[in-house]
Regions:
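Membrane/wall-proximal cationic-aromatic binding patches
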Residues: 35-120, 373
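Serine-dependent acyl-ester chemistry module
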Residues: 106, 161-354, 358, 366-379, ...
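Short coil turns that delineate tetratricopeptide repeat
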Residues: 152, 305-306, 339, 481, ...
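Register position in tetratricopeptide repeats
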Residues: 286, 320, 496, 530, ...
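Start-of-helix register in tetratricopeptide repeats
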Residues: 309, 485, 519, 553, ...
Length: 640
C-alpha cells in the first residue's frame, strides 16, 4: 500500500507528465516545424536593402479552422530600420481601407502615398496598407501593439462597417459575449504551436470536405440578422467603442499620431433584408406615381414603424417629390433598420466621434463630405459601387481628407515639393486602366451572388476593351498572373499599341507600389522622353540609375538627353560609363549609341577629329545606325 507521500508524488507525476510532454512537443514544433511560425512581419531583401514584409497569412488566427476563406493582409514592404529620413504612415481598417474592389493605385493608402510623395519628395514616404476584408475592431485592437512596434509616424483609421459580422461579432460564443476579455485570451492561445498545428490540420480536413460557392459575405454573416435597437446591436456597438478607445490609446501611448474617420455608405442602396418587401411599391415609383406610392407607404408605416423597406421606399418617394430632407431621414432609417448589418448604422459614427473627442484625436467627417458631394445630399451611385465600397473618386475624396488633416497637424516633414494636392485624374494619380478595370470585374463578381439580387454594375472600361486587354485583366483577377507581371505586360502592350499615356500611368502605378525597382522607372522615362516631357524623363532616368548604376540603357538615354541640353561634362561621364559596362558583351547597338553620343559631344565642343573617330566606331558596331550616319554626313558636308 502506498504511503501518503508516495501517493502525492504519483499524483503529481500523473498530472505533470502530460504537461511535460506537451511542453516538449511545443518546443519541438518551434524548432522542427518552421512553417508553423507565423510572425506579423518577416525580414526580406530588395537588392541590398533590408526590408520587412507583412505576413499576408497572419489573419488566420482570427478565423475558425473550418473557414473556407481566410482574408489576407497586403504583403507590403517597409524598411527594416526606420531612420530619420523615413516618414511612415499606416492605413488601418476593413475592406474599404484595403481598397475593394481595387488592388493597386485607386485605394486610400495608394492615393495618400501619391499625394504625400508629391508634396514631400525629400523624405522617403512609406504608406502601408493594413486594411483587410471581413475584419473588425476586435482584430485591429489585437493587432495594434504589433503595428505600434513598427514605429509609424501616423496611423489613419477607417473602420466600423464589419462590427457585426467580423471575427467574434454576433457569431461570438455566448461566454465571450459575457466576458469579452476571453476573446483576447483565445487569440493569444492561437499563437501556441500545438494549437496552430491542430487548427491547420482541422482546417485542411474541413475545407477538403466542403463544397459550394466561396462567398465571404455569406461565410462571415451566416445569414444572421440583427434588429435595430436590439440587445445584440447595443452590445456589438458598445464593444466597438471599447475597442476603438483601446486602439487609439495603444498608439497614443507610444507618441504616434492617430487620425480617425467616421464611415460612410450608400443611402440609395436598398436594404438587404427587411420584414416585408412591399412588391407593389417599386412599380409605382418606377412609373412616376410618387404621390400614390407615398400614400400607401404611410399606411404601411402605421402598421410597422421599424420596417427597412417601408422607410427605404418612403425615402425614394420623398426624393422623387423633391423633399430631400425627408428623403434623407427615411433613407438613413432604412439603412439602420436593415436586418443584414453589412452597413454600419448611424450609432457607429456617433461612437467614433464621441471616442475621438474624449481621446483628443482628430476625426474626419467623411460621411458629411460624401453627402455634400452627392446629388440632393444623399449618398448613392455617384460615389459608391454598391452598398459601401467607394468608387475611385470616392476613395480619392477620403484620401484627400486624410492628407489635408495631416497637413493641418504638425507631424509632416518640411515641404520641398509642389504646392497643392494633385488633381483627380488618371495621369496625375497614376491610375492604371488595369486596376480600374479590375475593379469592374471584382464588383461584378461580388454583386452577382448572395446577398445581392438583380444588381447590375456598370463596366464601361471592360465593355470598350479589346480582347487582349480583357484577357490580361481577367488573368490577374483569376490570379493566373501576378500584379507586377500583369502591369509590365499591359504597359508593354499599350506602348506597342500607341497608347503611351496609359503605359506611363501603369509604370507610374508600379513605381508607387515598388519604389526600389529600377525597370519601371527606366521604361517610364523612355516614354516620357518620346512624349517630349524631358524634365520628368531626366528625373526618372536619374532615379533608375540611382537604383541600378550598372544599367547601361538608362545611362545611354540620359547621356544623349544631356548632350542635347548642352550638359556635355555629365553626358560624357554617363556615356563613357555605359561603354565600360557593355565592354566585352555582344551588345553592338547600345555601344553604337554610346559612341554616337560621345561623337556628338565632341562635335558640339569643336573636336571634329575625335567626333569622326567615335562615329567610325559607332558605324563599325552598327553599320546601319542612322543617327551616326547622318551626323557623319553633316560634319563632312560642313568641312567642305
Amino acid at each position: 500500500m502506498l504511503s501518503g507521500k508516495r501517493r502525492l508524488l504519483f499524483r503529481l507525476i500523473s498530472v505533470l507528465f502530460p504537461l511535460v510532454l506537451l511542453l516538449l512537443l511545443e518546443v519541438s514544433l518551434r524548432f522542427f516545424a518552421p512553417s508553423l511560425d507565423s510572425p506579423f512581419v518577416r525580414e526580406a531583401a530588395v537588392d541590398t536593402v533590408r526590408m520587412l514584409q507583412v505576413n499576408r497569412a497572419y489573419l488566420e488566427r482570427y478565423f475558425p479552422a473550418n473557414a473556407p476563406m481566410v482574408p489576407e493582409l497586403k504583403p507590403g514592404l517597409m524598411r527594416a530600420r526606420k531612420t530619420k529620413g523615413v516618414f511612415r504612415v499606416f492605413c488601418v481598417g476593413e475592406s474599404s481601407m484595403l481598397g475593394t474592389p481595387y488592388e493597386l493605385s485607386a485605394t486610400i493608402p495608394a492615393l495618400v502615398r501619391k499625394q504625400l510623395r508629391h508634396l514631400f519628395p525629400a523624405p522617403e514616404i512609406e504608406v502601408m496598407n493594413f486594411g483587410a476584408s471581413a475584419i473588425n475592431s476586435n482584430v485591429v485592437a489585437d493587432l495594434a501593439p504589433s503595428l505600434a512596434d513598427l514605429s509609424p509616424d501616423a496611423v489613419l483609421l477607417y473602420l466600423g462597417h464589419n462590427e457585426f459580422y467580423g471575427p467574434d461579432g454576433v457569431g461570438a460564443p455566448w461566454i465571450e459575449k459575457k466576458f469579452p476579455a476571453l476573446t483576447e485570451l483565445k487569440y493569444r492561445a492561437r499563437d501556441i504551436r500545438i494549437v496552430r498545428l491542430a487548427q491547420r490540420m482541422l482546417g485542411s480536413f474541413m475545407r477538403g470536405s466542403q463544397d459550394g460557392e466561396r462567398n465571404l459575405m455569406k461565410q462571415v454573416s451566416r445569414g444572421a440578422t440583427v434588429e435595430a435597437g436590439s440587445a445584440e446591436e447595443v452590445r456589438v456597438i458598445g464593444r466597438f467603442g471599447e475597442n476603438l478607445r483601446r486602439i487609439i490609446k495603444t498608439f497614443r501611448d507610444r507618441g504616434i499620431c492617430v487620425i480617425a474617420s467616421d464611415v460612410t455608405s450608400s443611402l440609395m442602396f436598398p436594404p438587404f433584408i427587411s420584414g416585408a418587401r412591399h412588391e407593389e411599391i417599386p412599380p409605382l415609383i418606377a412609373s412616376g406615381n410618387f404621390t400614390e406610392a407615398l400614400g400607401r407607404l404611410e399606411v404601411l408605416k402605421g402598421t410597422d414603424t421599424a420596417d427597412a423597406f417601408t422607410d427605404y421606399w418612403l425615402g425614394r418617394a420623398h426624393l422623387a417629390l423633391g423633399d430631400t430632407r425627408e428623403a434623407a431621414r427615411f433613407l438613413r432609417r432604412a439603412r439602420d433598420e436593415d436586418l443584414l448589418k453589412f452597413r454600419a448604422p448611424a450609432r457607429t459614427d456617433s461612437i467614433i466621434h464621441s471616442v475621438c473627442r474624449e481621446e483628443s484625436v482628430p476625426c474626419i467627417a467623411v460621411d458629411s463630405i460624401f453627402s455634400a458631394l452627392s446629388p440632393a445630399g444623399i449618398t448613392g451611385a455617384t460615389l459608391f459601387w454598391e452598398h459601401l465600397h467607394p468608387t475611385a473618386r470616392g476613395y480619392d475624396i477620403i484620401a484627400r481628407a486624410f492628407v489635408g488633416e495631416m497637413i493641418r497637424l504638425p507631424i509632416l516633414p518640411p515641404s520641398g515639393g509642389e504646392p497643392g494636392l494633385l488633381p483627380f485624374d488618371a495621369d496625375s494619380l497614376s491610375l492604371s486602366w488595369l486596376d480600374l478595370a479590375y475593379g469592374e470585374i471584382s464588383v461584378r463578381a461580388l454583386t452577382g451572388r448572395w446577398p445581392f439580387t438583380d444588381f447590375i454594375s456598370p463596366s464601361p472600361l471592360l465593355d470598350s476593351a479589346d480582347p487582349a486587354e480583357r484577357k490580361m485583366v481577367t488573368d490577374v483577377y483569376l490570379k493566373k498572373t501576378g500584379w507586377t507581371d500583369a502591369c509590365l505586360q499591359f504597359a508593354s502592350y499599350e506602348e506597342k499599341s500607341g497608347r503611351a499615356r496609359e503605359a506611363i500611368r501603369t509604370y507610374g502605378a508600379l513605381i508607387e507600389e515598388y519604389p526600389f525597382e529600377y525597370y519601371p522607372r527606366y521604361r517610364r522615362a523612355a516614354l516620357l522622353r518620346d512624349e517630349g516631357d524631358i524634365t520628368r524623363a531626366v528625373a526618372e532616368y536619374r532615379r533608375a540609375i540611382a537604383l541600378n548604376p550598372a544599367h547601361a540603357y538608362s545611362l545611354i538615354d540620359l547621356g544623349l538627353i544631356l548632350n542635347n541640353a548642352g550638359e556635355f561634362d555629365e553626358a560624357r561621364v554617363r556615356l563613357s560609363r555605359a561603354l565600360e559596362l557593355t565592354g566585352g558583351k555582344d551588345l553592338p547597338l547600345p555601344r553604337a549609341q554610346a559612341c554616337y553620343g560621345l561623337a556628338a559631344i565632341c562635335a558640339n565642343t569643336g573636336d571634329i577629329p575625335k567626333a569622326l573617330a567615335w562615329l567610325d566606331e559607332s558605324l563599325r558596331l552598327a553599320p546601319s545606325y542612322a543617327p551616326a550616319r547622318q551626323l557623319r554626313a553633316q560634319i563632312l558636308a560642313h568641312a567642305r
